Regions:
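Collagenous Gly-X-Y triple-helix signature in extracellular proteins
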Residues: 1-185
Length: 185
């Protein structure tokens, strides 16, 4: 009989697929983007659903969104205390995933529906089940991605509750599943 066991160990050698505890959430390593860094994504959406913008617009993209500001506020960052977070290139400690990281550059992306990114799909996201996440108190949830849905001035791309992609109105409150970098010792 073959049995898979999950074990907890102390190590500084992080691998893709390793899981850590972040407050009352868990997060899984998705990539090792550089020397001494590991990129993690929460396995669940944050407890509170959030709007990308208070108004239904994708003007300014994720960089100028209300959600980006809220995601990097002390109110949210307090859940990540105890981790040695490293900033992304834009200085943020938390960010949303890009379409390419979740889905790769698939047919929908190549149709021109999605704001372009230069990201490769994370290995674990090749399995649809890994793109699906829940939010506390909800049986299913949709979640924001950074990319604009370019066929509508009011929408951004999302991961739907069954792991496929869509566009959704920016003023809707849905799931937020942050990615973050950790400095490895």
């Amino acid at each position: 009989m073959k049995i898979n066991r999950t074990m907890t160990i102390e190590t500084n050698e992080i691998q893709i697929g390793d899981r850590i505890q972040v407050g009352h959430y868990t997060a899984t390593c998705q990539a090792l983007p550089g020397e001494g860094l590991a990129l993690f994504l929460l396995d669940q959406y944050l407890d509170k659903a959030m709007q990308m913008n208070k108004r239904s617009t994708n003007k300014g993209g994720y960089q100028e969104s209300d959600l980006r500001e809220e995601l990097n506020s002390e109110k949210i960052l307090k859940d990540f205390t105890g981790l040695e977070l490293a900033p992304f290139d834009n200085g943020d400690l938390l960010r949303l995933p890009f379409y390419g990281e979740m889905f790769g550059h698939d047919d929908w992306y190549n149709s021109g529906a999605v704001e372009p990114d230069d990201c490769e799909q994370w290995p674990l996201m090749k399995e649809r089940a890994n793109r699906v996440a829940e939010r506390k108190g909800e049986s299913y949830e949709w979640g924001w991605l950074q990319n604009k849905y370019v066929r509508s001035a009011s929408a951004f791309c999302v991961v739907r509750y069954h792991g496929d992609a869509a566009g959704w109105v920016a003023s809707s409150s849905i799931g937020v599943r942050p990615a973050f970098l950790i400095k490895l010792s």
